[in-house]
């Protein structure tokens, strides 16, 4: 018999929230732990759990700080940022002003997506100017206001890149301003609000990361490790990063009935 408990330690992917959650799971005697590892501060708590005999898998976000986790399941986040940069370049015709809205500057996963984007723009698309970078704490309403502010400050703005949560807020601002197709949005994830804006032509592209696998694989592989000593075939299981646009959205999403 197996029981999987879903614990939400806080609203941000930082050690301030996740470290106490890992400590609590250790204290409560869980046999294994799967956790987001959003910043380096989580690493010593992962190590403490492993040293207490509790295997740990990380998913979605992984710190670069060395730690004793068994495996990571998630996207190559820097590569996702590079993919987003090329999608944006396609959307804006390789030139113009682009703004960046990230979730948290302190979350390593968001930084990888941000720097993958900005590095690629600088290296491959010299005619694209990044006019500003702000954080929205993964909130759609904040992204809405920030997108409005960018469009007001830069009347010739051609694109908005959202690295993490709340891209539908930026898309709503673009739609409300009557600038769908004029200000292009590139984002991540296949949540319904985002996919509707893709279908409507407001979001040019959104990039997936297979969240089902990120939930499924850590649980199954930790179970197999516990009961059979089966070690995962590799320490990093990288999920697919499909790029969805209005042209192929029917392959990935159907509107809710």
Language model: regions and residue ranges:
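Short, solvent-exposed amphipathic alpha-helices that sit
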Residues: 1, 17, 80-84, 108-128, ...
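Flexible loop/hinge segments that line or gate small-molecule binding clefts
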Residues: 40-79, 97, 191-199, 203-204, ...
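Hinge/cleft segment of the Venus flytrap/periplasmic-binding protein
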Residues: 105, 109, 120-122, 210-257
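Hydrophobic alpha-helical segments within soluble ligand-binding/sensing domains
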Residues: 72-98, 112, 143-144, 190-194, ...
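Hydrophobic alpha-helical
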Residues: 19-22, 32-51, 117, 132-195
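Short beta-strand elements in bilobed, periplasmic/extracellular small-molecule ligand-binding domains
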Residues: 1-14, 18, 97-100, 121-140
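Exported/periplasmic ABC-transporter solute-binding proteins
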Residues: 158-159, 172-212, 220, 227-231, ...
């Amino acid at each position: 018999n197996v029981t999987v408990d879903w614990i939400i330690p806080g609203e941000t992917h930082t050690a301030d929230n996740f470290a106490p959650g890992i400590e609590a799971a250790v204290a409560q005697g869980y046999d294994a732990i799967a956790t987001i590892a959003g910043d380096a501060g989580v690493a010593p708590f992962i190590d403490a759990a492993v040293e207490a005999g509790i295997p740990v898998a990380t998913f979605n976000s992984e710190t670069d700080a060395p730690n004793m986790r068994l495996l990571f399941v998630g996207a190559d986040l820097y590569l996702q940022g590079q993919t987003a940069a090329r999608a944006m370049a396609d959307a804006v015709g390789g030139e113009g002003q682009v703004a960046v809205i990230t979730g948290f500057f302190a979350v390593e996963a968001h930084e990888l997506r941000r720097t993958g984007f900005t590095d690629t723009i600088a290296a491959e698309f010299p005619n694209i100017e990044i006019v500003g970078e702000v954080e929205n704490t993964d909130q759609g309403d904040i992204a809405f206001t920030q997108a409005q502010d960018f469009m007001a400050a830069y009347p010739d703005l051609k694109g908005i890149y959202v690295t993490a949560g709340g891209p539908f807020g930026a898309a709503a601002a673009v739609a409300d301003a009557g600038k769908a197709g004029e200000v292009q949005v590139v984002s991540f994830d296949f949540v319904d609000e985002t996919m509707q804006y893709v279908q409507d032509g407001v979001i040019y592209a959104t990039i997936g990361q297979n969240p089902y696998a990120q939930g499924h694989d850590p649980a199954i592989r930790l179970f197999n490790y516990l009961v059979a000593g089966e070690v995962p075939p590799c320490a990093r299981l990288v999920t697919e990063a499909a790029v969805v646009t209005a042209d192929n959205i029917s392959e990935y999403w159907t509107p809710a009935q």
